């Protein structure tokens, strides 16, 4: 009897499947559902917008090229053009004008200029890569105290522009460090005394300086907050409104296309543990380029960033360490046969990944595709290393962590993936530059990793024993969390300074080739400055998606 009972229990135990422990994150669901799937592009409306832009565009071009317009007026016009996201329509015209104006520049002529004028000139030249000297701001400092003059605060418009100028600083420009701190402090005080549009302008610049913003969202907000200033140029105001609505239609069609692809894959249903973030990640990639002719770049890169997110959540929020090793091995092999060794839930992701990259070969840029693929494999290996640390409950040294953590920012794979659809601009030399792991990519990764870690450290600790850069820094240097966070934020600020310098002429490659790197970095700041905007999109990205795709600009 006892033997029979023992045999029965043994048989039952052998048939029992022990469910592995998984560090589920319980991510919030998509707040959009299938909302963007139902969009239908109205080609007649698109054509109407295109036609409506023709004359205003020509009028603005004539103003940019008009030799009778003085320097202040011309630079003010160019400032409005790029703040409104219109630069690509006039790139050659603007470059030609700025080259001439910069050659003629005489810093002595700024001795009598006001704060607003000097700040606008500084921003325009720095934005387009010219090494405009920050010494022009010395005149606003008190000669005895060495501090900025208090009476500057009466010029609110000038203070806003001074704060924007400070965001373009590079290392060694201590006067701009001081200017940024001074302007921020005074604007926070001034904001409490203001109302109406001026109060909104101050609030916005403190929340989101242009140099760290999403260019399409910033265009929309600039159009609303500064319409009175723009209205001096009737044609520019009309062009900006029509242009935004024109791009909105095109971008909604791109978002519909990607949403349908995602829906057809049915990955969220097959991998219930992942974040479903199609509109949010499309907005992320939209930060690269606004140009209509880069539509394919946006679609390709959005598809890959969605697969990156699934991969991230698989390693981070679901896979056991054994499954993680199998997935990494399969991605390293990059063969259909490798799928056989994977758990069932991983097979759809792996199959889709291989199919998507196979589809890219129709572009005929094998070397570019291989560069993206290698970066994806490197990303998988780095995700796996983080899994090994988590499994061992190990906190690596700060140096060890950053070698891996910068890669898992995914900036390298996404910037290289963008090259697939960029055409002949990606020369052999340009690709070699990207493959050399240039400093600007390293800076982008550093900023991305540290900003993400600083805002998500508590969430990661609550969910699983996951080491972040904060933990690694605390362990390596024996400091408190507050001290570690303060130091990491300083590293981020220095990263921005170096990034600004990398965009000054002469650049190693064209600005178009730098755009994906800059766009990724800006979106990191947008999403992670105050919270984890990708995991909890209702806090930041919901507003962006609403502004971009749900409401056209009133005409």
From Swiss-Prot:
Expression by tissue: Mainly expressed in sunflower trichomes.
Q: Which residues form the signal peptide?
A: none
For activity, the cofactor(s) needed are: Mg(2+)
Q: Which Pfam families match?
A: Terpene_synth, Terpene_synth_C
The record's catalysed reaction(s) read:
(2E,6E)-farnesyl diphosphate = alpha-copaene + diphosphate; (2E,6E)-farnesyl diphosphate = alpha-muurolene + diphosphate; (2E,6E)-farnesyl diphosphate = alpha-humulene + diphosphate
Q: Which residues form a coiled coil?
A: none
Protein residues bound to Mg(2+) 1: 312, 316
Short sequence motif DDXXD motif: positions: 312-316
| GO BP terms, alphabetized | diterpenoid biosynthetic process; sesquiterpene biosynthetic process
Q: Does the keyword Cell cycle apply?
A: no
Q: Please give the function described in this protein's UniProt entry.
A: Involved in the biosynthesis of germacrene-derived sesquiterpene lactones. Catalyzes the cyclization of farnesyl diphosphate to alpha-copaene, delta-cadinene, alpha-muurolene, beta-caryophyllene and alpha-humulene.
Tell me the domain of life.
Eukaryota
Residue sites binding Mg(2+) 3 per the record: 452, 456, 460
Q: Name one GO molecular function term.
A: magnesium ion binding
User: Could you tell me what the cofactor note in this record states?
Assistant: Binds 3 Mg(2+) ions per subunit.
- Under which name does UniProt file this protein? Alpha-copaene synthase
Enzyme Commission number, as recorded: 4.2.3.133, 4.2.3.104, 4.2.3.125
Q: Which family does it belong to?
A: Belongs to the terpene synthase family.
Could you tell me which InterPro entries the record lists for this protein?
Answer: Isoprenoid_synthase_dom_sf, Terpene_cyclase-like_1_C, Terpene_cyclase_plant_C1, Terpene_synth_N, Terpene_synth_N_sf, Terpene_synthase-like, Terpene_synthase_metal-bd, Terpenoid_cyclase/PrenylTrfase
């Amino acid at each position: 009897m006892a033997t029979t009972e023992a045999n029965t229990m043994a048989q039952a135990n052998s048939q029992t499947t022990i469910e592995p422990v998984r560090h589920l994150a319980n991510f919030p669901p998509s707040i959009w559902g299938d909302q963007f799937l139902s969009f239908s592009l109205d080609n007649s409306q698109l054509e109407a917008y295109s036609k409506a832009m023709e004359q205003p565009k020509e009028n603005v071009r004539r103003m940019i090229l008009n030799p009778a317009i003085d320097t202040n007026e011309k630079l003010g016009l160019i400032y409005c053009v790029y703040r409104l996201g219109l630069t690509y329509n006039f790139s050659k015209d603007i470059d030609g004008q700025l080259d001439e104006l910069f050659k003629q520049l005489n810093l002595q002529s700024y001795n009598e200029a006001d704060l607003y004028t000097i700040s606008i000139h500084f921003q325009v030249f720095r934005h387009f890569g010219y090494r405009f000297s920050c010494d022009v701001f010395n005149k606003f400092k008190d000669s005895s105290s060495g501090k900025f003059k208090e009476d500057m605060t009466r010029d609110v418009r000038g203070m806003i522009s001074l704060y924007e100028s400070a965001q373009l600083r590079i290392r060694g420009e201590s006067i701009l460090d001081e200017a940024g701190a001074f302007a921020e402090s005074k604007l926070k005080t001034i904001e409490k005394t203001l109302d109406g549009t001026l109060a909104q302008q101050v609030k916005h610049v403190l929340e989101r300086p242009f140099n760290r913003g999403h260019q399409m969202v910033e265009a929309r907000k600039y159009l609303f907050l500064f319409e009175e200033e723009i209205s001096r140029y009737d044609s520019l105001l009309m062009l900006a409104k029509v242009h935004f609505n024109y791009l909105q239609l095109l971008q909604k069609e791109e978002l519909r296309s990607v949403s349908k692809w995602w829906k057809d894959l049915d990955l969220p249903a097959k991998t219930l543990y992942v974040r479903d973030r199609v509109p949010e990640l499309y907005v992320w990639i939209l930060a690269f380029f606004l140009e209509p002719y880069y539509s394919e770049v946006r679609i390709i890169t959005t598809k890959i960033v969605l697969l990156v997110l699934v991969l991230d959540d698989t390693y981070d929020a679901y896979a056991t360490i054994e499954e993680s090793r199998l997935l990494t091995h399969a991605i390293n092999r990059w063969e259909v046969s490798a799928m056989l060794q994977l758990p069932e839930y991983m097979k759809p992701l792996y199959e889709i990944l291989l199919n998507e990259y196979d589809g890219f070969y129709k572009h005929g840029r094998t070397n570019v595709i291989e560069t993206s693929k290698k970066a994806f494999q490197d990303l998988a290996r780095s995700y796996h290393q983080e899994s090994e640390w988590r499994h061992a409950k190990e906190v690596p040294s700060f140096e060890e962590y950053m070698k891996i953590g910068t890669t898992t920012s995914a900036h390298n794979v996404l910037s290289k993936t963008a090259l697939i659809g960029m055409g002949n601009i990606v020369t052999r030399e340009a690709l070699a530059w990207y493959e050399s792991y240039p400093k600007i990519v390293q800076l982008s990764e550093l900023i991305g990793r540290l900003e993400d870690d600083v805002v998500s450290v508590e969430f990661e600790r609550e969910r699983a024993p996951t080491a972040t850069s904060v933990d690694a820094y605390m362990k390596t240097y024996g400091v408190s969390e507050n001290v570690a966070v303060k130091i990491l934020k300083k590293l981020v600020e220095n990263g921005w300074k170096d990034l600004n310098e990398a965009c000054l002429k002469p650049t190693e490659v064209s600005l178009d080739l730098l755009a994906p790197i800059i766009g990724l970095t800006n979106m990191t700041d947008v999403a992670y400055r105050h919270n984890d905007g990708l995991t909890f999109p209702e806090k930041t990205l919901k507003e962006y998606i609403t502004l971009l795709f749900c409401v056209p600009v009133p005409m």
